[in-house]
């Protein structure tokens, strides 16, 4: 009889898979299900499923909307989660805004530019600090060629509505940002740039971008930096303060 023992230091795939009930089912042809689309959404382990069921069967209520027992418990859980997430990414709890997903989060930021611009064009008063969100014809928005549509289409829409110009940072044959390119490199960030939107880690290539370098160039000309961190936060330590981005979006449903 042959006995195979796991090699020390290697991941025990079967043990990990056992935590995910959906992986116990079979796929086409009766073969064991293999899931490789965690970049879109990750499957949920038993601990997460149990926690969600526990909330809905024991604590479900609208948060910050009541003083009864369930409302207090739900609100406490909600704010505890906010603190845990802030600790995870090196942020302050007051800086976190919960949205349905990262697409909505990025759209929320892009709408800030569209709305502030529309108000300014109609001569309406702007809230304190909103002037930096006003875009004028000839202002520029910089994106990269490796962006997910969620961090591209919103900026195309903003450019179309405001008259701003969309500029691109290119990608090398190796799948990295081509920051040294004379026309499509870091030099596209200039005194007309108002916002720079980029991914931290490509959902297609896995490339990790030099966010700090790009953010430094953007801030030097007064531009805001919007970072898509959906693929990086689940897979590596992320400190949003150290990265230097002004807005960072990531998704809870992709965390495993």
Regions found by a protein language model. Give the residues of each.
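Pyridoxal 5′-phosphate
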Residues: 1-256
């Amino acid at each position: 009889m042959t006995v195979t023992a796991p090699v020390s230091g290697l991941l025990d795939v079967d043990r990990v898979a056992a935590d995910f009930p959906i992986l116990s089912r079979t796929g086409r042809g009766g073969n064991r299900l293999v899931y490789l689309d965690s970049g879109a959404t990750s499957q949920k382990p038993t601990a997460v499923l149990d926690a969600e069921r526990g909330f809905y069967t024991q604590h479900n209520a609208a948060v910050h909307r009541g003083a009864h027992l369930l409302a207090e418990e739900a609100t406490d859980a909600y704010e505890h989660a906010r603190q845990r997430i802030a600790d995870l990414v090196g942020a302050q709890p007051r800086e976190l805004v919960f949205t349905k997903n990262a697409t909505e989060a990025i759209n929320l930021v892009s709408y800030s530019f569209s709305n502030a611009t529309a108000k300014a064009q109609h001569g309406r008063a702007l809230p304190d600090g909103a002037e930096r969100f006003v875009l004028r014809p000839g202002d520029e928005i910089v994106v990269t060629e490796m962006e997910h549509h969620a961090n591209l289409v919103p900026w195309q829409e903003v450019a179309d509505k405001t008259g701003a110009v969309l500029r691109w940072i290119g990608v090398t044959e190796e799948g990295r940002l081509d920051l040294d390119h004379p026309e499509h490199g870091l030099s596209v960030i200039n005194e007309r740039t108002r916002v720079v939107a980029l991914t931290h880690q490509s959902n297609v290539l896995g490339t990790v971008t030099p966010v700090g370098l790009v953010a430094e160039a953007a801030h030097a000309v007064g531009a805001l930096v919007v970072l898509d961190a959906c693929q990086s936060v689940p897979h590596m330590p992320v400190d949003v303060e150290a990265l230097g981005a002004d807005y960072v979006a990531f998704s809870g449903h992709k965390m495993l």
